[in-house]
Amino acid sequence: MNSERSDVTLYQPFLDYAIAYMRSRLDLEPYPIPTGFESNSAVVGKGKNQEEVVTTSYAFQTAKLRQIRAAHVQGGNSLQVLNFVIFPHLNYDLPFFGADLVTLPGGHLIALDMQPLFRDDSAYQAKYTEPILPIFHAHQQHLSWGGDFPEEAQPFFSPAFLWTRPQETAVVETQVFAAFKDYLKAYLDFVEQAEAVTDSQNLVAIKQAQLRYLRYRAEKDPARGMFKRFYGAEWTEEYIHGFLFDLERKLTVVK
């Protein structure tokens, strides 16, 4: 099932499901998207290969979740991207929810995880990683490991990191979609149970861990080159620092 029609809107069902499911479980409020970043488009290629690339942004917030945001890139059969990340408020020790769903001319790249604040803390792993390992193992049987990824990135991923490169679009539409649903459900279960942190030392550690993660993601964002090519360097850097990974900017404003 590798049809063009299927690929063109490959990740729209993921996005639609996530928003509807979150609405059913959370009291979602809009999160402000800076002017000029709600959507953008560019025409790339020439002649028969000409294609419009459209990037659309979505953002929400709740009492426990500082920013729930998605960047959806649609550029025809050979370019489909959904980057969907949930950032908790700084007074919760929740992990980040991260889904990177990417289709390029060379194939599909899928990354799903609950990215830990404190990866090497055994109590943190017991609280947030061990409960989801059965979900990881169940899906890993059908979604083989995607191969090496940068060593510098490893501290930001949990032992339940689902990283795979499916060959078939049908696998994305079925098994990857099922994994996405299960990970999101488990994450919202954690959110439901989460209690605010009040200890000042722990709050400092959470803030430092969040900033460490966001700085890494902003610096190493693999979409930077793609966005620069489509929309220019100025728009790209502002989109990355002012929307996709905006915590540092928000904290500066608060000061």
Curated annotation (Swiss-Prot):
One Gene Ontology term from the biological process aspect of the record: phytochromobilin biosynthetic process
Name of the protein in question: Phycoerythrobilin:ferredoxin oxidoreductase
GO MF, one annotated term: cobalt ion binding
EC assignment: 1.3.7.3
Reactions this protein catalyses: (3Z)-phycoerythrobilin + oxidized 2[4Fe-4S]-[ferredoxin] = 15,16-dihydrobiliverdin + reduced 2[4Fe-4S]-[ferredoxin] + 2 H(+)
Function: Catalyzes the two-electron reduction of the C2 and C3(1) diene system of 15,16-dihydrobiliverdin.
Source species: Nostoc punctiforme (strain ATCC 29133 / PCC 73102)
Keyword Phosphoprotein attributed: no
Claim: Oxidoreductase is one of the keywords in the record: yes
Pfam families associated with the record: Fe_bilin_red
The family this protein is said to belong to: Belongs to the HY2 family.
InterPro entries: Ferredoxin-dep_bilin_Rdtase, Phycoerythrobilin_Fdx_Rdtase
Keywords assigned by UniProt, alphabetized: Oxidoreductase
